[in-house]
Amino acid sequence: MPSVKLTHHSPPDTIASDSVRLLSRETLRISASLASPPVDDLPPHSPPPPDSQFLHSTLRLICCEEIDGRRFKYVAESDGSGRFKKNSVRAISLESPQTPFDEVGSFLRSYVVPEGFPGSVNESYVPYMTWRALKHFFGGAMGVFTTQTLLNSVGASRNSSASAAVAINWILKDGAGRVGKMLFARQGKKFDYDLKQLRFAGDLLMELGAGVELATAAVPHLFLPLACAANVVKNVAAVTSTSTRTPIYKAFAKGENIGDVTAKGECVGNIADLMGTGFSILISKRNPSLVTTFGLLSCGYLMSSYQEVRSVVLHTLNRARFTVAVESFLKTGRVPSLQEGNIQEKIFTFPWVDDRPVMLGARFKDAFQDPSTYMAVKPFFDKERYMVTYSPTKGKVYALLKHQANSDDILKAAFHAHVLLHFMNQSKDGNPRSVEQLDPAFAPTEYELESRIAESCEMVSTSYGVFKSRAAEQGWRMSESLLNPGRARLCHVKEGE
């Protein structure tokens, strides 16, 4: 661009014209630089550099985040001296709002296709499910006629309005159960990660449904709503049982005999069910107390269910078994065996309750409320595909995953989070405690947090490989961990780029 000579006296119109052209050219240059950041310097689809994007604003870009295809950028307010104001982090969506049609489509996809579809299944999935849906359509239609026929066979008149009402009520009850089964199927991914916990929770629901069914005897005028509620609960339990059955049988099979193992397992269950039916017929002749009988049978059912899932030995590490393994390693230097790890796994925890002290794959807004904390922690993880931090207000350790994180990075992030939790517990009272005992009131200073993170980084660099090798020696399949991380991924933007 030619230099502008200030001593040259041009006519006013010429000076104004030159100024306009110069201003327009500079505006276009700045706009182009903002719209097209250098590909080699910035991550793909990265937002514009913070200094240029907020040139005349106190807001500064910290990082960007992607979750389920939606992208967000996080900004914080500067106080003018280069420091950030506390609790000034704000999330700005980079996506236009979804139309109602798109929202309905996303809602339906979350129920009828697996996560990651179509990449998570092979090409035969779609034709199989298409024909399966058609089969169930005809089966559902046939069910109405079979129900009416059965009711007529036991004495209900075909032309009676009462029999028609009974048939409709019965069909509505079954329909409500199918709706409940469909709604709970959205939790399908959790069946892979926490199958023991979900299996036991399903058995609890089964007994709850049985109790609601028995309650219809006390309030017969509420038969339909109670029967519908009971059928919903019992169908949810049935989904849980069906979805967790195959992984459990797979753990027993040593070769390509999973079909045989499954068939024999179901046969054992059916034989025991028939024996239980015969037993109930015998004792029902004596007219025992309904409440007492239900209480005793339910206790036996739930105790057997608990011991059933507790006896399963799985070779993979979900969050519960991973916690057992890491805690043992940090305290004793050894990784528990498969039998020990599975026995110590907690069954009375429900995957949909987020009360764990370690949050894996968390969102940025949950992990960081103070932007200065993020800027202080970030340099420790520049060479990693994750980062960990501790939130004193929530009493939890958060592991955030970067966009390129693979399965080993997720495993390492989870290990690092537990190590940091171990150090935070030590800083509180000098004695390492269980991860379930973290005190939310403990609020370390920023310097203390940096010190603990530095210590954890040093320990992870020397002990993570040792942990993996010792876990593999015990038979744990480290390459098939089921840690169920959150779907949020960070895309970092460095200041000044």
From Swiss-Prot:
It comes from the Eukaryota. Pfam families: RUS6_N (PF24162), UVB_sens_C (PF24160), UVB_sens_prot (PF04884). InterPro entries: RUS_fam, UVB_sens_C, UVB_sens_RUS_dom. Belongs to the RUS1 family. Required for normal embryo development. PANTHER family: PROTEIN ROOT UVB SENSITIVE 6 (PTHR12770:SF20), RUS1 FAMILY PROTEIN C16ORF58 (PTHR12770). This is Protein root UVB sensitive 6.
